[in-house]
Swiss-Prot record:
Biological-process GO terms, alphabetical: isoleucine biosynthetic process; L-valine biosynthetic process
Cofactor binding summary note: Binds 1 [2Fe-2S] cluster per subunit. This cluster acts as a Lewis acid cofactor.
GO function terms (MF aspect): 2 iron, 2 sulfur cluster binding; dihydroxy-acid dehydratase activity; magnesium ion binding
Cofactor(s) the protein needs: [2Fe-2S] cluster; Mg(2+)
Enzyme class: lyase
Protein family per UniProt: Belongs to the IlvD/Edd family.
Keywords assigned by UniProt, alphabetized: 2Fe-2S, Amino-acid biosynthesis, Branched-chain amino acid biosynthesis, Iron, Iron-sulfur, Lyase, Magnesium, Metal-binding
Protein's organism: Pseudomonas paraeruginosa (strain DSM 24068 / PA7) (Pseudomonas aeruginosa (strain PA7))
EC number, as in UniProt: 4.2.1.9
Name of the protein this chain belongs to: Dihydroxy-acid dehydratase
PANTHER family given in the database record: D-XYLONATE DEHYDRATASE, D-XYLONATE DEHYDRATASE YAGF-RELATED
Pathway: Amino-acid biosynthesis; L-isoleucine biosynthesis; L-isoleucine from 2-oxobutanoate: step 3/4; Amino-acid biosynthesis; L-valine biosynthesis; L-valine from pyruvate: step 3/4
């Protein structure tokens, strides 16, 4: 059986100095026989999804100690993509994922911790911690801060979120008073933004990967029920330590739980619920850390057979995460997928022997456990707050309507094919991705004229300046991992196209990426990126581009001979933006760009450059 990793610094005469330091943190003689469990928290006052996490690490710590472990908390950084959006701050968002992963590795390995509880929530924090957990491969439990309640206003018949505020702000026909009302109402509580944006998508996927508890992705940040997830996570971490270090059961290690089948399950869920395209980027990165051979071709294969069973904002205004929870949360979607023969149910989770066992217990349409039904009735209170667990509101009933409800059965799916698709063609030889859940069926096949912008800033200026017309395909390039650097999100360009009434009359293609709040014919992650010699860098104004989602293709309608001539000319000039950009790129960002791969590889570091 494996020894505690922590024995490296807690046992032996030569570790007297280390033990002296451990004692200075509060450890006693009896503690040196216990597992040391790291709590990776991500509290910050900069991010609404993390503002309520300050005391939750210690909540978990006390539970770890009651269960027989030693808890040691540390913090990571967290970037708010919404606040960093639309300016050079967004250059730092994706690179922060690598910093978070590294910081968790540094702290856990430097202090020889035996296990981790990861307290995450927003866009890059969950992926960064997931990458670290799979890299370290020691027992881990994820517990997130939970989603925000949807906003409410008398000016709208539906729940509000961040994107609503952005769209009305860019709409010249909206009064200042309406904009102010939306601004004050869109984000009423702590928690990750209320739709199926990147943060909530990733927290849901940790359930499908088997690394978090049921309800992790959908239980509101404000609801009292969420406290139980934190308490259970602390106890479970100690239990996993006992199974691995005490009994030699390596099935509890994250790489044995998050195996190839589990990654397929996670992507299947993502496609079925119309999650953010960013999840593709993050799952590919996590798979590389886990040494799982899961790539874009697997995602393409799954996207052709998995139906869309759930539609949530920004893909539909009617539903937000609180509605997903009322409909039974993630395990109800997984249950429908399992009954459709689309899920691997023999994989283990941190909390159940198999996914089949977990579905039997947690799917509201299958279980008779009244406690489970009560759990999924947890709803919003509609009271602005930054305090976790501050309300105990219940829906009067569950949404178990699988024909017309928030979550559908396979037979009543919103669409036969799921909410994400991978497109290939001469403009993106290694692929690009589109969130089909947010694309109107009338433009699933779209041919248009290329309108070139060498940066997101230029595109925003062009769209707001009415340079973009109906029938245009906006091309935003040199915004990939290397070219940006940092692969900015393009939420402002897509939101402004909507506000200009062009949401169904234009398309957008970029080697950058999109916010989970994006909808419309928005195609990102074009690989190879322009800065790496990708064909997106060869497109010229007025070129015709054909997008064909049903046939999973995207092509520049230019002859091979012409493309070859353009490539030779670009090789001579160098793969850089044609127009200069007023962008200050720091040393930290240059270091990221030096090692970054294109999006089809998850925008992770190119290890070949490190290994020589």
């Amino acid at each position: 059986m494996p020894d505690y990793r922590s024995k490296t610094s807690t046992h032996g005469r030569n570790m007297a100095g280390a033990r002296a330091l451990w004692r200075a943190t509060g450890m006693k003689d009896e503690d040196f026989k216990k597992p040391i469990i790291a709590i990776a928290n991500s509290f910050t006052q900069f991010v609404p999804g993390h503002v309520h996490l300050k005391d939750l690490g210690q909540l978990v710590a006390r539970e770890i100690e009651k269960a027989g472990g030693v808890a040691k908390e540390f913090n990571t950084i967290a970037v708010d993509d919404g606040i960093a959006m639309g300016h050079d701050g967004m250059l730092y968002s994706l690179p922060s994922r690598e910093i978070i992963a590294d910081s968790v590795e540094y702290m856990v390995n430097a202090h020889c911790a035996d296990a981790i509880v990861c307290i995450s929530n927003c866009d890059k924090i969950t992926p960064g911690m997931l990458m670290a957990a799979l890299r370290l491969n020691i027992p881990v439990v994820f517990v997130s801060g939970g989603p925000m309640e949807a906003g409410k206003t008398k000016l709208a018949s539906h729940g509000l979120d961040l994107v609503d505020a952005m769209v009305v702000a860019a709409d010249d026909s909206c009064s200042d008073e309406k904009v102010a009302e939306y601004e004050r109402s869109a984000c009423p509580t702590c928690g990750s933004c209320s739709g199926m944006f990147t943060a909530n998508s990733m927290n849901c996927l940790t359930e499908a990967l088997g690394l978090s508890l049921p309800g992790n992705g959908s239980t509101l940040a404000t609801h009292a029920d969420r406290e139980q997830l934190f308490l259970r996570a602390g106890r479970l971490a100690v239990e996993l330590c006992q199974r691995y270090y005490g009994e030699g059961d390596d099935s509890v290690l994250p790489r044995n739980i998050a195996n190839f089948k589990a990654f397929e399950n996670a992507m299947t869920l993502d496609i079925a619920m119309g999650g953010s395209t960013n999840t593709i980027l993050h799952l590919l990165a996590a798979a590389q850390e886990a040494e799982v051979p899961f790539d874009l071709r697997d995602i393409d294969r799954l996207s052709r057979k998995v139906p869309q069973l759930c539609k949530v904002a920004p893909n539909i205004q009617k539903y937000h995460m609180e509605d997903v929870h009322r409909a039974g949360g993630i395990f109800s979607i997984l249950g429908e997928l399992a009954r459709g023969g689309l899920l691997h149910t023999d994989v283990a989770t941190v909390h159940s022997p198999s996914m089949a066992d977990a579905i039997a217990r947690w799917d509201i349409t299958q279980t008779r456990d009244e406690a489970v039904h009560t759990f999924f009735k947890a709803g919003p209170a509609g009271i602005p707050t930054q305090t976790a667990f501050s309300q105990n509101t219940r829906w009067p009933s569950l949404d178990d309507d699988r024909a017309e409800g928030c979550i559908r059965s396979v037979e009543h799916a919103y669409s036969k094919e799921g909410g994400l698709a991978v497109l290939y063609g001469n403009i993106a030889l290694d692929g690009c991705v589109v969130k089909t859940a947010g694309v109107d069926e009338s433009i699933h096949v779209f041919e248009g004229r290329a309108k070139i912008f060498e940066s997101q800033d230029a595109a925003v200026k062009g769209i707001l300046g009415d340079e973009v017309k109906a029938g245009d395909i906006v091309i935003i390039r040199y915004e990939g991992p290397k070219g940006g650097p940092g692969m900015q999100e393009m939420l402002y360009p897509t939101s402004y196209l909507k506000s200009k009434g062009l949401g169904k009359q234009c398309a957008l293609l970029t080697d950058g990426r999109f916010s989970g709040g994006t909808s419309g014919l928005s195609i990102g992650h074009a690989s190879p990126e322009a800065a790496a010699g990708g064909a997106i860098g060869l497109v010229q104004d007025g070129d015709k581009v054909l997008i064909d989602i049903p046939n999973r293709s995207i092509n520049l309608l230019v002859s091979d001979e012409e493309l070859a001539a353009r490539r030779a000319e670009q090789d001579r000039k160098g793969w850089k933006p044609a127009a200069p950009r007023a962008r200050r790129v720091s040393t930290a960002l240059k270091a990221y760009a030096l090692l970054a791969t294109s999006a089809d590889k998850g925008a992770v570091r190119n290890k070949a450059l490190l290994d020589g």
